[in-house]
Amino acid sequence: MSELLSFALFLASVLIYAWKAGRNTWWFAATLTVLGLFVVLNITLFASDYFTGDGINDAVLYTLTNSLTGAGVSKYILPGIGIVLGLAAVFGALGWILRRRRHHPHHFGYSLLALLLALGSVDASPAFRQITELVKSQSRDGDPDFTAYYKEPSKTIPDPKLNLVYIYGESLERTYFDNEVFPDLTPELGALKNEGLDFSHTQQLPGTDYTIAGMVASQCGIPLFAPFEGNASASVSSFFPQNICLGDILKNSGYQNYFVQGANLRFAGKDVFLKSHGFDHLYGSEELKSVVADPHYRNDWGFYDDTVLDEAWKKFEELSRSGQRFSLFTLTVDTHHPDGFISRTCNRKKYDFDGKPNQSFSAVSCSQENIATFINKIKASPWFKDTVIVVSSDHLAMNNTAWKYLNKQDRNNLFFVIRGDKPQQETLAVKRNTMDNGATVLDILGGDNYLGLGRSSLSGQSMSEIFLNIKEKTLAWKPDIIRLWKFPKEMKEFTIDQQKNMIAFSGSHFRLPLLLRVSDKRVEPLPESEYSAPLRFQLADFAPRDNFVWVDRCYKMAQLWAPELALSTDWCVSQGQLGGQQIVQHVDKAIWKGKTAFKDTVIDMARYKGNVDTLKIVDNDIRYKADSFIFNVAGAPEEVKQFSGISRPESWGRWSNAQLGDEVKIEYKHPLPKKFDLVITAKAYGNNASRPIPVRVGNEEQALVLGNEVTTTTLHFDNPTDADTLVIVPPEPVSTNEGNILGHSPRKLGIGMVEIKVVEREG
């Protein structure tokens, strides 16, 4: 209803101004600005809904102030360009319509009416309401009834008798299981769901809408609200340290807790969360690569579901035979947006919908088959009678190729339980949410029927039943939940541990690198993650007078304030204000102690603008003083004009990447010497080893031969044509996820470059 009212007010404003208001520059500018704001808000809502499926939420608020990086971003470039072009076209058309009667006399009454209608259209728009609610949630002090509803359970289960297998299906929401809408999409897992306790109305709340947030909600009974973006939680050393979560209770009750997934455990701080709450045995892509049958059988995120669930079955067998009490949690990945992945062992590799193949539906059909196979193995084993199996989605599906079909349905998360000790077949339509999952499992295992804000759906009343406005209520509790982190409110002294790559202050510990905004009564940590902007880009968003402490590799801040450290990969500490004074200190001891020293100086806006502009320089445009190209730092020597075909810096150097260019090209500002030696320190990847690698300067070509280990080779070149470009052509680039950023498309690696130096020869 509000959408129609908002649009009607917008249309009325446009028509009244265009046909009645007449000519006046000020009224035209004011009306166009407000109407333009309406357009921007609604396009933002449309774009946000495209990515999140939930309108403008916390994730969008974070993304709007940081870079959009991570898995599948290239899939959204065209829609993004379309939105920008559409916005420009709408603004142009709007301006043209409003000025149609610019030659008529100005009418104050109609101009005022048009402006008021435009303001009303903005106020009535769902986008404005969502943003207003988000802003309020950032500034609230909390809700006084939080302590009445947040309940800590007993730390132990009195007499535990059952083992637990808990399967998180990535984005595997219950909507997929509607056989009338999606025929024969989930037959195997759907049949198992119908054999157990099926909870059909599990809604998604704010702070539970991505993987680590869904895990926290289901195990701790609280949404993941933090003083930083949730997926950046890999930088903290402990996770809700004061809270009692399901894993803590299981461990205290004698359970050995295991977690198995195909992706890297460090992503989004899953390792930190699980270790903080009772899990001592964790297996991710790094831990599994020496165990699995085929370590090269991987997708963009890690190992395929069939591999992961095979390892989970082996672990279930091993633990069951040992006779010890255990819980085994596992997380799939093949159904990750935007397209999903198809395991090679499943029979259901293709699913057509709406008359054409659909990759996301195909991935769902394949993954559910793999999960069902795993469950059926457990059911057929002699240990099933002592086991409770839980299957749940971590969150609703995000924007994938099935998303527009899902949105036509009443969407709910998946949660069902199969009991080996006491078979129960029932569909329970009680209103509930993800936070109730842990409490329900705890109740089944013989513990309390509450956990944080979660309540057992078998013997308690969910917050979703108590509060009709549960989404708004959850946001009202956000400050209370953030306070559970027990974050420090001041930073005066700090310690950096180079061996552990950690910084400690006021009782808290964080992984490096780290950026901190320090005010009188608040310390705001801004970690770096796969989905956040680099810290220097985040620092560029600081106000001129904001106090900051920035701990990072020296070369990243050297271009601003310490050019002598431009090639150093050691840790450095910078602090100050972007519009005032800044200092850079080299961390030169294993345990380095520092103090904050913020001076109340006069703000220089020219200095501020210069600092911001420098911070925003992209890596490939950075230049440093050096007589060689050093590949383990960002940028290039001052003599280099541009380069291509080279991946990002890593601790040892950089790989060539044929996804960015078939050849490595380094173009210098001036012609290379007439005679010179090219000293190359490098290694080869895969089949590029021990093969001639063409290296060209102008018309001359030399062959470079490298092994899999780093070596230094000198090639002799004559350059009679004054060529200014060096070209290296890896013969067989290999597509691989080795060393890749989690969730990014595979790189095509050829050679790994450590240093390239041009040495002029006499004569």
Curated annotation (Swiss-Prot):
GO terms for cellular component: plasma membrane. Its EC number is 2.7.8.20. It is a multi-pass membrane protein. It is found in: Cell inner membrane. One of its GO terms (molecular function) is phosphatidylglycerol-membrane-oligosaccharide glycerophosphotransferase activity. It is an enzyme of class 2 (transferase). The keyword Protein biosynthesis does not apply. Gene3D superfamilies: Alkaline Phosphatase, subunit A. The keyword Cell membrane applies. Keywords: Cell inner membrane, Cell membrane, Membrane, Transferase, Transmembrane, Transmembrane helix. It comes from the Bacteria. The chain crosses the membrane at residues 1-21, 26-46, 77-97, 108-128. One of its GO terms (biological process) is glucan biosynthetic process. Belongs to the OpgB family. PANTHER family: LIPOTEICHOIC ACID SYNTHASE (PTHR47371), PHOSPHOGLYCEROL TRANSFERASE I (PTHR47371:SF3). NCBIfam families: PRK03776.1 (NF003000). Transfers a phosphoglycerol residue from phosphatidylglycerol to the membrane-bound nascent glucan backbones. This is Phosphoglycerol transferase I. It comes from Escherichia coli O6:K15:H31 (strain 536 / UPEC). The lineage of its organism: Bacteria, Pseudomonadati, Pseudomonadota, Gammaproteobacteria, Enterobacterales.
